[in-house]
């Protein structure tokens, strides 16, 4: 029995990659220094994996920003607008990921989307008429040889041709048709080069196969691989899937020329049933994904061994594997000195998951009497308490009316127009303002008990004063307090709710250099005291204008945390919803007129197969949001915000959330959402983000005016809000002030024309 992993976290044990790239962006280090840091990280990760006894060690899973972008660059799928900047290869790469504004030109970044059902974001490759698709890159070969120099025969990992083709944004059908053959030829050339290097295994990741596949999808997949696999020669090909099962194509894969199939037995609900029904091919190896790559709880070896024994009825050719990339979990628990050992022993981050694979291999190669098995089973005895009877009783007492807000949206809209007295096209921001080094230092000093609570609060209040003053000077209509007291929109609430645990160093990559530290939902959740009330009251006291109360919604708190596995996601979300509901009512009672409840991650756990959308997710996720705000008065305006996602197919469900205003991140997708909003007669007032805050470029008044006009051409003027597409926490003040001034100027210019 051997073992494998799909891929490993890139950012480093202490986010070394993040800091190295950010230094390069600020021109504080050279290209050579950045690439040296990256090379050292790769070497360290390979050695960690090798030392853990993993047999199939991945290469080419490392990325400076995003592996989808890496794959596009490998095959020269780069839009002409980036080529025309005439930058060197590295800066052209970063121009695609961040946008570019300088002496060589002014271009926006590629669109960003959620990677399937995760909180990782990928960049959408763009292919236009001038794109010459060919194997022009060498990253996959260089990194294979790099590992080889360290004495490691690695398994290069690459996004498969079918998934890549489905993810590319083609200019039109003609461009797409021409690209198909060119891309196939490029993959064939890649196979030839890997054969020249005498590579043994290539892993092709095809997660798109876990979606609902049409006949056309299956035909396209077969067309690609019937040709491609004829060129594999001595190269062995592992077709790797994750985030679901292969029910639409599994029987065909058994008859294909792939040397191995990677199945997900964690999220793949039907993976085991498919093997039981159709068996497994004698000429193939099964890479069995049984170590959860998306959650941090320790593996129960008894369950894994039971699964392996069942699979062995159908094949003896089994490799133990992760369910997906370990990119989605933190690096290692060894940096967690503050978590009680009674909890910590029950968690496995990326490095510990390597150990779990090693243990399982050793147990399977010996017997179940192995001490490693006994030690694992001991972990699950005498675990810390998780239940709270008061929370259970409160959930049980919920009635149907607790999930419905009255009066109707139309009635509320009239009441709110009269009460709030806002102008046409009201301007606002999404919530957070830049968190400079002094803000982070103040928070750290307070956490380390180097300053008093009073000093900490006074510092934040001064920052709030400055933030309110800046917004008033710019001329925004609805203000925010800036969120200087918050480290993260989820972690901050988790820290103030009972039932959560926190890591010191549990960082996970969200996109590029953006890392998040997800809380761990351990027990039943409740609110023990007000969380945001003091900050919101203080901020509102500083201005005659409305200052929004800012909260994170229950679905996002769940989706951006590591969830419990002992109760349903529905129950866990409803517990959080009740806690946030208490906060909403406190804010309203304190005179806060607009309360924003962000559901940035609403789409994240939406099942990848449409048949499961309602029964497994939307039927409880939407009511959980309703539960949060159903108790407020008609005059209180409820806002929500949603991050990069595909919304067009769930807009009716989003409308059913019954918020009064919703802001979307829409700028990177060229506001393509507007046509769908119009088509479904979306009732909620909307703020489609008018510029991309994830890029350092400052949009001009002219650019913003054109964007606002585009929105007005699609939606009624009474329904529109003007705002950036996300919070401003990660930007510099000079960028923020310049952009917001242009936003207000553009809005005022358009108002005069209405």
From Swiss-Prot:
List of residues binding 5-methyltetrahydropteroyltri-L-glutamate: 15-18, 114, 514-515, 560, 604
Keywords: Amino-acid biosynthesis, Metal-binding, Methionine biosynthesis, Methyltransferase, Repeat, Transferase, Zinc
Active site: 694
EC category name: transferase
Keyword Zinc: yes
Pathway(s) where this gene product acts: Amino-acid biosynthesis; L-methionine biosynthesis via de novo pathway; L-methionine from L-homocysteine (MetE route): step 1/1
EC number: 2.1.1.14
Catalysed conversion reaction: 5-methyltetrahydropteroyltri-L-glutamate + L-homocysteine = tetrahydropteroyltri-L-glutamate + L-methionine
Primary role: Catalyzes the transfer of a methyl group from 5-methyltetrahydrofolate to homocysteine resulting in methionine formation.
Name listed for the protein in its UniProt record: 5-methyltetrahydropteroyltriglutamate--homocysteine methyltransferase
High-level lineage: Bacteria, Pseudomonadati, Campylobacterota, Epsilonproteobacteria, Campylobacterales
